[in-house]
């Protein structure tokens, strides 16, 4: 939010506790952070997320969206979940500015969040509910014009919402991925493209049972079924 910190202790008094605890975990000596599976293949369970994998995923996304040290990223999702964690890691990897706001159904509401005023945002991520609620307010809807790229994930994007997104200047992308693949591995441009496309060297195939196989060479596991 326009501030520079040289150590975690400086951040303790300014940052949300949840964010501080994640950064404390990120900069500790372990090679992983704790997360929870998406629940798409069974009951959610605690897993270890490789920091190396998270960095690789962040670099892949940053390369696609041309994120660098001059960029501004918006964090409006909980860092308890992979989407929030990864936005922080993308900012760290790029040396970009991270604009943090209170997690709510109205992330573009300026009241109490004056750091938003006239800020250009290069990349943001929201769940469909946040986008839908923001579109109901004319002032919040106008603020989408300040966001260059918006990733929408965590739940399906309805046809009605997709149609509304075609009327704003923001380049909007639906995401495909899960905690196990360390955030998204494919995107669909909602304003135009009808199909998902894989990022980087990610590839998809089916096994003899018809199950989806994800080949992700940038991750240590490389293959997910």
Feature-to-residue mapping (PLM):
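AMP-binding/adenylate-forming
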Residues: 51-56, 72-133
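Conserved AMP-binding A3 loop
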Residues: 32-59, 66
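Conserved pre-ATP/AMP-binding loop-to-beta segment of ANL
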Residues: 18-36, 70
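Glycine-rich helix-loop-beta junction characteristic of Rossmann-like nucleotide cofactor-binding loops
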Residues: 63-68, 115, 140-143
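Conserved S/T- and glycine-rich ATP-binding loop of Class I adenylate-forming
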Residues: 37-40, 73, 88, 124, ...
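Conserved ATP-binding loop and adjacent catalytic segment of the adenylate-forming AMP-binding
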Residues: 170-210, 216-222
